[in-house]
Amino acid sequence: MVYSYTEKKRIRKDFGKRPQVLDIPYLLSIQLDSFQKFIEQDPEGQHGLEAAFRSVFPIKSYSGNSELQYVSYRLGEPVFDVKECQIRGVTFSAPLRVKLRLVIYEREAPEGTVKDIKEQEVYMGEIPLMTDNGTFVINGTERVIVSQLHRSPGVFFDSDKGKTHSSGKVLYNARIIPYRGSWLDFEFDPKDNLFVRIDRRRKLPATIILRALGYSTAQILDLFFDKIVYEINGNKLQMDLVPERLRGETASFDIEANGKVYIEKGRRITARHIRQLEKDSIERIEVPVEYIAGKVLSKDYIDESTGELIGAANMELSLDLLAKLSQSGHKRIETLFTNDLDHGAYMSETVRVDPSSDRLSALVEIYRMMRPGEPPTREAAETLFENLFFSEDRYDLSAVGRMKFNRSLLRDEIEGSGILSKDDIIEVMKKLIDIRNGKGEVDDIDHLGNRRIRSVGEMAENQFRVGLVRVERAVKERLSLGDLDTLMPQDMINAKPISAAVKEFFGSSQLSQFMDQNNPLSEITHKRRISALGPGGLTRERAGFEVRDVHPTHYGRVCPIETPEGPNIGLINSLSVYAQTNEYGFLETPYRRVRENVVTDEIHYLSAIEEGNFVIAQANTNLDEEGRFIDELVTCRNKGESSLFSRDQVEYMDVSTQQIVSVGASLIPFLEHDDANRALMGANMQRQAVPTLRADKPLVGTGMERAVAVDSGVTAVAKRGGTVQYVDASRIVIRVNDDEMYPGEAGIDIYNLTKYTRSNQNTCISQMPCVSLGEPVERGDVLADGPSTDLGELALGQNMRVAFMPWNGYNFEDSILVSERVVQEDRFTTIHIQELACVSRDTKLGPEEITADIPNVGEAALSKLDESGIVYIGAEVTGGDILVGKVTPKGETQLTPEEKLLRAIFGEKASDVKDSSLRVPNGVSGTIIDVQVFTRDGVEKDKRALEIEEMQLKQAKKDLTEELQILEAGLFGRIHAVLVSGGVEADKLDKLPRERWLELGLTDEDKQNQLEQLAEQYDELKHEFEKKLEAKRRKITQGDDLAPGVLKIVKVYLAVKRQIQPGDKMAGRHGNKGVISKINPIEDMPYDENGTPVDIVLNPLGVPSRMNIGQILETHLGMAAKGIGEKINAMLKQHEEVTKLREFIQRAYDLGDDLRQKVDLSTFSDEEVMRLAENLKKGMPIATPVFDGAKEKEIKELLQMGGIPTSGQITLYDGRTGEQFERQVTVGYMYMLKLNHLVDDKMHARSTGSYSLVTQQPLGGKAQFGGQRFGEMEVWALEAYGAAYTLQEMLTVKSDDVNGRTKMYKNIVDGNHQMEPGMPESFNVLLKEIRSLGINIELEEK
């Protein structure tokens, strides 16, 4: 395997055995590709904005004399970049401009004669843009649009499984779901009549819809039934015989022909009888006349001489009717063929209950059902029915819906019209009747072939279309009313409805969510999340167990492990690692093709529909070198079931062992040894890990860490290869390799790093360079680590030395005992950044003012504010400190004479304003790291705002100047090379000032041309610099666009450093979570024979019942990795020769059976080996991929190599007494995470505070500074103790006895410790409530 210079710094030893046939795909592609489809120009008009415009335009006026046509659209450039949008609190979006054409036709002239054409570009609102990382910045906050898993359009056949009717009879139904438009349901009732519902309204007999389509009763019967023909021959009756139709019936007479009795009366007709009849080619038999009674006519019979209707279609035959038919000359009589077995008379019965008789009455029935209370007219009824399913404006099955519809009805072609046809409706009814007759199966609605993904692009397109349709109505009216000669397209279009629809979707849709930004994994998982909730989806309350359950088709598409615990379980899922969506929006997963028993590297993506037809082997099937199956029988999946198949039957094979899990679950080592419930918790808790101060790569990983860190976008990744020319904390400059440069450019890439920025979850985002000056880098190398990444690998926690043993009850019930060393070394110290905002508004009484002159506040409280009343950067503040001084005007109040006197003496100011300053919340303390001031346009900026502005201008100029200097240096380097190669002496050239170089002329024409090109570039560079600087200056100095009524906003950023402490929640990656119970002195912790104390003591009882054995294996393997690291460290300390080091490290990499990873250290230089050794001395990182990890034998070998007992257990000594513990203890290294459930955020205490308005009881919760509820059960406890006075105090003065509270305060001040309880307010509330019900209750004194 070839490693780049950067990758050689630290190589993770991989225990994976299966070759990696397919690289991990880009993990955010589901978001980026979908949105790209939405905004890119699509000449076909199949999707995106183009499709939305084409579906609504052209808009014709009601008269048809004019129309507004769509020509094209373009998206402009966004005003602010992503960072500026986040700081200013605005949306990152681009203006949408649409070219429209207004065509006016001549009124009197023949159709299509154009009178006038006007074309104009119209502004149609702003479209939010996606950032490079798949998020949207809406009003300054990063949001993610979660993909939705919804029921695919098409036709579905289902049953109620016998739950609707008391008899337990199974009722079948069919539902046609369009992408847009009315739903059409067909359903059987318990009497086996077929009914139809439109949009889930009241049901009508299904034949109504057929009559509305223009079918008569006879035609309806002809569509759904086979016929039996009887011929009247004198007194005899003969029947055309189809032997197959007799199966299962009992003969009601002797069936004979040609004098031979085939079946005797009363006998059941079997397959043997049928074969006999077919063999003798019996096509006609004689039947008794009574046999025809009760049969149903299939068409109308008319007396030709009188024109009178004798027998109507669907009429039951009686012997009298038969005689009448015979007399009127009808000798051949057609009846419907029905039986109880597989040809039910359902449609015939339905026609009988149908109140309509012709097309008009059917249309009127449908109209009455859809628009109850409105008088129907023929036109209205026809228009309504036409618009329901046959109008392209109102109904659209979409390409997906048509494909699913045709597949379900077993048609050959999968394309067709978006609206329904007569045949479509009839075929659905026929299939439903077939299913009721026992032919065919109902669909499984939880099958992923019947559920599809709607991603950002598609949902945004739908919302945009909704906005356009609103505009369409207004345009139609304008075209009809206005004076068209003076109107322009601009006057027709109001962009508000479109902007509103788009804004509503991105801002407040259920699927537009505040991004989970705890760490890179939580970001990536949030973007790959798939929700069944949301508009057009399920609701939590209505979703049953089936929808939430894991389905066989989830394999390789949706993760069976990662889903939330609680009410959303199974409704919110995560995309599997390799899954992607196909053109129709169905999830597909890759497989390797198997040809003639050989597994090829040819990859096919199969959707759930296609997969069912194939036999697919698992990824861990044994193969020989040539890719042939070794075993005769192979475990495979087929039609959703797993079983053994012969190796010759296998058609596909899984791509990878981690194909079935999501990104989160694929990061859990030894996942295969964990119980699924705990794995679920482990996957979910990794997303809650807070980035620590110094990230520490996991010693035991799975090999997915690099992919997650790079794809999440938190690291800085090299766009092109080159050499590091400059590096500091905030910028990395790369001189690009010549072969990767574009013609005519400076060949310098500049990467500006993010420093100490606040994330959505208040954690800290900061990047640190991980390359040094002069290092070569290749495209895709990680240049700088972000939060929770270490040398380009995801690092959510810390490697801790753990021991599994009880310790004085401090690890009872999952508690965790932590050594003080962990706190001293800042292993789990995290930085949290809070944003506190102070808004100055224009009130009715006058503007609020931000000032340091605050009434009734002492000097000490103002010590950290500057003269503008805003806190200094760097100030250390604690709860209650003033950050921004603000005063609000007070209303005029009636003054007492004393107050008037005071006013007269001390001046006006102090009394007519009240203090409304921004203070630090209680319980928070930290350092101010940044202050931003936003001032409304037209409001004078205060001194602090001007200082900040000046500082920003200086910084911007400095950054741009440095950037220019770097680019200039690169450019002049190339100019120097051209001049020297053109014959100019280097010494003389170096003496000349650089600007003069461009004035030199060369004799070589090619070189001269090159020189001129470079000179042009230089001018362009300077021009570009001026332009950029001017744009920056304009952005910084201009006023801000603030909400109405807001004059000024001051944002203060407060950084809090939190060390780990008792009450914080920690967890491993295997669902093993707990709360810290005690931080123990280092000297009291258990230690080993070398005197090394352990960091964490865990309870061994947390393992067996939870069945997450993965944590034990991780501990052993971590110990082995650390042992090898220590051996390398010892060799480094003793300054061993590089050859010995190389040999030892090579042995470590080669350990294990047939590994896929081949590390050849002989290709590494001595310097590279030394650097690798330096990075390995704290432990050799190991990858054990999911379902393909290290075996027990390999772990033991590695332990042995690290000089650790193969049992993984060692003797420990008690730190307090020095005595040996009586048995050996499992000690090793486990990767522990600190979760975002910190005790500082939860700890809360209250003495007095705010009270509820109605009940006068203290409020609840930390946010309201509330009290602790003394509830019903607590009252019982005090009652049980007989503590009457304590109870009285709790229920009165400590709670809602208002007068008692005030008296109590007065008594305490007076030193009289008595209480006088009165009437609790909640009792008065109860009395009032009872009185409101009309029952008077009065309290009488005894």
Curated annotation (Swiss-Prot):
One of its GO terms (molecular function) is ribonucleoside binding. Pfam families: RNA_pol_Rpb2_1, RNA_pol_Rpb2_2, RNA_pol_Rpb2_3, RNA_pol_Rpb2_45, RNA_pol_Rpb2_6, RNA_pol_Rpb2_7. It catalyses: RNA(n) + a ribonucleoside 5'-triphosphate = RNA(n+1) + diphosphate. The keyword Transmembrane helix does not apply. Keywords: DNA-directed RNA polymerase, Nucleotidyltransferase, Transcription, Transferase. It is an enzyme of class 2 (transferase). Gene3D superfamilies: 2.40.50.100, 2.40.50.150, 3.90.1100.10, 6.10.140.1670, DNA-directed RNA polymerase, beta subunit, external 1 domain, DNA-directed RNA polymerase, subunit 2, domain 6, RNA polymerase alpha subunit dimerisation domain, RNA polymerase Rpb2, domain 2. InterPro entries: DNA-dir_RNA_pol_bsu_ext_1_sf (IPR042107), DNA-dir_RNA_pol_bsu_external_1 (IPR019462), DNA-dir_RNA_pol_su2 (IPR015712), DNA-dir_RNAP_su2_dom (IPR007120), DNA-dir_RNAP_su2_hyb_sf (IPR037033), RNA_pol_bsu_bac (IPR010243), RNA_pol_bsu_CS (IPR007121), RNA_pol_bsu_protrusion (IPR007644). GO terms for cellular component: DNA-directed RNA polymerase complex. Its EC number is 2.7.7.6. One of its GO terms (biological process) is DNA-templated transcription. DNA-dependent RNA polymerase catalyzes the transcription of DNA into RNA using the four ribonucleoside triphosphates as substrates. The RNAP catalytic core consists of 2 alpha, 1 beta, 1 beta' and 1 omega subunit. When a sigma factor is associated with the core the holoenzyme is formed, which can initiate transcription. Belongs to the RNA polymerase beta chain family. This is DNA-directed RNA polymerase subunit beta. It comes from Pectobacterium atrosepticum (strain SCRI 1043 / ATCC BAA-672) (Erwinia carotovora subsp. atroseptica). The lineage of its organism: Bacteria, Pseudomonadati, Pseudomonadota, Gammaproteobacteria, Enterobacterales.
